[in-house]
């Protein structure tokens, strides 16, 4: 039995007057991408069951650069020899591009700060990210120190960082985080940050990063946005401060925290690919960037080859990307439902017919092609829940067959029956096989061996039939070639049907292209049967379709 009485609200709203209206609430979308800092190689790596090897970290680092990250936290060099060695590999091997800045993490502890500067020596550019925890819980339970004592830890750390930055050659930027910010009183967090800023003395030309992390997610996202806006308005040197956010996902709202924080004044986001990180993970860089992209905002990150990024990530981290992960999961564009498939197929057709550049396709928020996914393999998926629209779409996209709507419906029943009985999803190839087996070029028990036409009293057809192994030649007249053949078959067999539907189209391009024909027949008892035929001769294709429809009775 769960006991909710042991919990309470653990966050601290900003000290504002009742009725105060925050400016961020007047905005409805992000207009410009923030600066991005990948923390995959630190926060992400430290949370892996098996941390990445040196070679794996190098491969991941190269991928982050290819995606477009300009700031990359490469580790906590004082924490382990692997992290130290990795940083030196980047520096000594000249693997830091001119437009990329590496970031290193250090606690506000004397020997760790000194070790960090040793590790980063010679880097063309580096962000020294120092931090200490400021939350009520950490002050009382972990450090057992007063507010003044905790603030002094931050100030002493800042003084040493500034001193060492003058002793070591290098192009350094600085970042300070009041760790566990979400469990800290906002006014106290600002007090500590301002004390650090007074030491560092940033300028517009040499700004400092103040990072307000969601170390543990403790509130609804709008509370965090309120805290960000209030702190932004009360920080000193505001024109010389880059306000950063670092959300975790404990309550499942990491993306919302980051998005609302940007609306509230955050200029920078620290994040991980696919939400990797401690506990429930850091905020997902992919979701954040693609959300902006879907609103027409260039995120400045390139996920145009999502399958390759996913494959590299899974191989190097040994983590699995959940199938429903936004934008990246295997099933995020997949439609199994018949009504969804029908709407998507019609949306795709509308886009093609109207040469529409703007993406408005139902059920699919971004064009799968933009991130390296395909319509045929990723969008329309066939199982027992699928409908005629999706099944027809699969045949058309993969094999060029554009079935009449009623024929799609007939095929749909057959496909759904097969999927239902086999309890599995069907591939495009399996759908094609069902179509061919059921409707295409069926030649038993009736087959037309040959047909000759003359224009006498309309069209006269002389048809050689094979019915159950018995050949017969019959002549009949019709309004057209197919009508004449249909009349000949009825005359020879005593069958009664009406040619209800006929359509055709080219399957290929060029002078030797194949044609596909579709025939629907209505019989005396009211039933309707369908057939399809293909041939380089459009007349032959039509006759094959007619024969297939008859044989489906």
Where do the PLM segments sit?
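A mid-to-C-terminal "edge-of-domain" accessory segment
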Residues: 2-42, 296-475, 511-514
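Short, small-residue-enriched loops and turns at beta-alpha junctions
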Residues: 43, 47, 77-81, 135-137, ...
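Catalytic alpha/beta core domains of metabolic enzymes, predominantly
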Residues: 219-352
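Alpha/beta enzyme core
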Residues: 4, 11, 36, 52-71, ...
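Mixed-charge, glycine-accented linear interaction segment located at domain edges/termini
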Residues: 527-530, 534-553
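N-terminal capping/small domains of soluble enzymes
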Residues: 1-110, 379-382, 386, 392
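Positively charged, aromatic-enriched nucleic acid-contacting surfaces
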Residues: 461-465, 507-530
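Short beta-alpha connecting loops at secondary-structure transitions
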Residues: 212-214, 242, 270-278, 290-302, ...
